[in-house]
């Protein structure tokens, strides 16, 4: 017999896909700026910048920055500290593009509800599927078998060919508040959802 959590993982749900640009940080190997006489690139330390670019691209598909644009802005604002971008830096960068980011602790139901409202979620993950240390990814959809679609700026395969259990993503969250809910208001004060929330997210 399946345990309750295992049965929940196998439930059929309405699939969801938040349409956003899927940036790979390895496509951005050129130096963006220098920090303490060291060249800074998106490829080496720009997973956070890539995630910000993906989220902004979801809300503003016709005016989306690329990861090197976001990293350059981080340098201009003094948000880079030598080993990538901190969580507050990501929140401040999103704010520069008119997107509100709020770091939270979330359970599986909260994650699903948030995605179904059309809000992408940036997650800071620790050791596990994506990294041995710290790394940023974007939760971008749900499959019909109840798993998460994740945009990993460090791996095209993990972005396009893999799906992930809610429980595993929650377990691998790093810190007390590893999830950042991303929202944007339009001119009327309503929450903007300019990226399409497509009802198809099937994966083999």
Q: Model-predicted segments: where are they?
A:
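Active-site-adjacent structural segments surrounding the nucleophilic cysteine of cysteine proteases
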Residues: 1-79, 203
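Noncatalytic regulatory segments and standalone regulatory/sensor domains
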Residues: 9-15, 20, 24, 142-204
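Extracytoplasmic/secreted envelope proteins and their assembly/folding machinery
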Residues: 44, 48-56, 67, 71, ...
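Sec/Tat-exported extracytoplasmic proteins
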Residues: 51, 55-63, 74-78, 94-98, ...
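Mid-length scaffold segments of soluble, non-membrane domains
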Residues: 65-106, 116
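Extracytoplasmic/secreted cell-surface and envelope-processing proteins
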Residues: 82-88, 130-135, 158-161
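Active-site-adjacent substructure of cysteine-protease-like catalytic cores
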Residues: 100-155, 185
């Amino acid at each position: 017999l399946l345990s309750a959590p295992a049965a929940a993982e196998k439930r059929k749900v309405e699939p969801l896909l938040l349409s956003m640009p899927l940036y790979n940080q390895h496509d951005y190997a050129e130096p963006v700026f220098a920090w303490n006489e060291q060249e800074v690139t998106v490829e080496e330390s720009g997973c956070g910048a890539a995630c910000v670019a993906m989220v902004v691209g979801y809300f503003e598909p016709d005016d989306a920055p690329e990861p090197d644009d976001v990293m350059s802005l981080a340098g201009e604002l003094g948000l880079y500290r030598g080993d990538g971008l901190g969580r507050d830096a990501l929140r401040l960068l999103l704010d520069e593009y008119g997107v509100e980011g709020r770091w939270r602790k979330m359970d599986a139901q909260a994650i699903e509800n948030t995605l179904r409202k059309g809000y992408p979620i940036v997650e800071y993950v620790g050791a596990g599927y994506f990294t041995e240390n710290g790394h940023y990814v974007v939760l971008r959809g749900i499959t019909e078998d109840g798993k998460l679609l994740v945009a990993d700026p460090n791996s095209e395969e993990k972005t396009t060919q893999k799906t992930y259990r809610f429980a595993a993503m929650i377990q691998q969250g790093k810190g007390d508040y590893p999830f950042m809910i991303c929202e944007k208001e339009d001119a009327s004060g309503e929450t903007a959802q300019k990226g399409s929330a497509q009802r198809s997210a099937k994966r083999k």
